[in-house]
């Protein structure tokens, strides 16, 4: 009986890897620590029945941001998206994209969400502001400090994908 359970568990793990094409799809990023961290977050989302669409089309080697800070940025954005989707229940999709437009690398994370007004989402980067309750509101201000330190920029907004609204945070760094 335990052998059959082991085989079933291995099959489920292999299906999980195949489903996300991991780590193969992430290898384009060329930063092993960042790859491992993103993979962990994708597995966490999968465990919560959250669907993630990943559009990873470039290396992160061309930006001068140390791995630890990329992990902080991407981890925070994914944590926020996963938390928001898990709490709301009716939304179940997250998108992550890492792209190169020739001048900048864009790291973008969004989750399915009702539209958020500009006057509110600009407050997300203020220390202590949170829609999640007390003792929160430190992650995005920290992300902003990192982005500023490495001369990047942040854009936030509502974007439509396949007729669904997503709240998206995009971080840009010069190549």
Predicted regions and their residues:
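Short beta-to-alpha transition helix within the HATPase_c
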Residues: 12, 27-48
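Short beta-strand/loop element within the Bergerat-fold HATPase_c
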Residues: 91-103
């Amino acid at each position: 009986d335990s052998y059959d359970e082991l085989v079933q568990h291995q099959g489920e793990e292999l299906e999980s890897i195949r489903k996300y094409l991991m780590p193969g799809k992430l290898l384009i990023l060329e930063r092993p620590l960042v790859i491992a961290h993103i993979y962990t977050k994708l597995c966490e989302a999968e465990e919560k029945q959250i669907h993630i669409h990943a559009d990873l089309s470039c290396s992160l080697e061309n930006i001068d941001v140390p791995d630890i800070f990329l992990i902080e940025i991407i981890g925070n954005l994914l944590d926020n998206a996963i938390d928001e989707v898990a709490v709301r229940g009716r939304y179940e999709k997250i998108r992550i994209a890492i792209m190169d437009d020739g001048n900048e690398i864009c790291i973008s994370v969004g989750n399915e969400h009702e539209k958020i007004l500009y006057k509110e989402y600009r407050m997300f980067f203020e220390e202590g502001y949170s829609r999640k309750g007390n003792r929160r509101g430190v992650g995005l201000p920290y992300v902003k400090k990192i982005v500023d330190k490495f001369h990047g920029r942040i854009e936030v907004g509502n974007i439509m994908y396949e007729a669904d609204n997503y709240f998206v945070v995009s971080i840009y760094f010069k190549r």
